[in-house]
């Protein structure tokens, strides 16, 4: 039975609008993350308990009460049912992760993009991840044949989980973790490939990404949340900033998924050559 139908059946007799019930939830380890309409918050505990009944792997249920905030990308969830301890461990594509999804952002929905990037990195490449978080891009890449990954993270809590995950996966010799703002602490002129997995005003960080790129050129993968109608202007910004740093840019745009009404999660794959 589908999740929404399950909730409707179990909440029979409770005055809720079935169309406002969530159609699904994200599982991170033992934690279920639920987007619940504000009008249903008074039933959050019941829905949380039913979510654990629906999926026996779930031991904690948290609802979203606001948007992800700030440069540290702090999510806004609170536990409404189950275990209050939301530090969890799980394996994705052979990589072991430890994190707290109520404290750091980890989207299981971006798994395909993480796997795509790890598959296109060539042996011997040096990769810089500008927004590493707990290592969701950096570690799948490092476990392959790339020579080294520099993983930069501004949030001390996410950075601590990043260090733990590097150790869990025995990647100490391949991943260099750096704590700080990527605009201030990025390595210079070393990278064959740069990953920018931050969605908000990402183009403002592009000059730093171009500075970390090898002078012989390479590829920048820039993610951003934007309306589709802004693609042309974003491509112009990319070309302009590349020219300022001595590069010519050849850009391919991909849609990853819908981010919010009218806004898409876009990826710009930017191939850069010396001008």
Regions found by a protein language model. Give the residues of each.
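SAM-dependent transferase fold signal centered on methyltransferase-like domains
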Residues: 1-275
